[in-house]
């Protein structure tokens, strides 16, 4: 998030070596770990040799199990970092309602878990493919995501990310997230959510096409 890019094994190997060299703890956010396209599964930082020596990984139920708003997650990895995290948790927050935690456990242990997750991933991949194809037909360049449920799209020349987002909202009735909200390197892009039905995504592209912004 927001680009849909996935980390390679080589990247993580360099990261582990860097963390060991400079004695820096690594925190990996694996929220979209189950959502990979084109037959590829995103690589967990914890799969790398030495990763548990230098870092931890967060996993949330919000994306994979559509439990956004329940605020249920867990962390695994380096014991010392986990202990420090628990200390912070104890002082800053109260525990999550136990019923929600047990629901998360049931979701992880459910026999049909993998089959249901695959259905969700297939749905996102179908939307991704249809949206990217429709966007390319009108000349809108995209970074094709390898995971997540977002598309990372270039802003046409002459507009900032915010200006383009405002234009789409006001003139086409299409809401996107301006890229500069994700940091300075996001300027020049917008993020599109692929969380609505296929027909509505195609309708959004049709509305944008009528603005004649792409050559």
What residue spans do the PLM features occupy?
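PLP-dependent class I/II
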Residues: 1-215
């Amino acid at each position: 998030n927001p680009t849909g890019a996935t980390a390679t094994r080589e990247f993580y190997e360099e990261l582990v070596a860097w963390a060991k060299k400079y004695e820096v703890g690594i925190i990996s956010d694996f929220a979209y770990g189950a959502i990979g396209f084109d037959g590829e599964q995103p690589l967990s930082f914890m799969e790398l040799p030495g990763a548990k020596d230098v870092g931890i990984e967060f996993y949330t139920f919000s994306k994979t199990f559509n439990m956004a708003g329940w605020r249920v997650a867990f962390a695994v990895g380096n014991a010392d970092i986990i202990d420090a995290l628990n200390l912070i948790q104890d002082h800053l927050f109260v525990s999550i309602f136990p019923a929600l935690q047990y629901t998360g456990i049931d979701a992880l242990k459910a026999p049909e878990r993998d089959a249901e997750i695959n259905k969700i991933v297939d749905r996102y991949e179908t939307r991704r493919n249809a949206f990217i194809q429709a966007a390319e037909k009108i000349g809108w360049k995209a970074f094709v995501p390898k995971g997540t449920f977002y598309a990372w799209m270039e802003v046409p020349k002459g507009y900032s990310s915010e200006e383009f987002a405002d234009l789409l909202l006001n003139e086409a009735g299409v809401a996107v997230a301006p890229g500069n909200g994700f940091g300075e390197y996001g300027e020049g892009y917008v993020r599109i959510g692929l969380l609505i039905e296929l027909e509505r995504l195609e309708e959004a592209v049709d509305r944008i096409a009528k603005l004649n912004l792409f050559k």
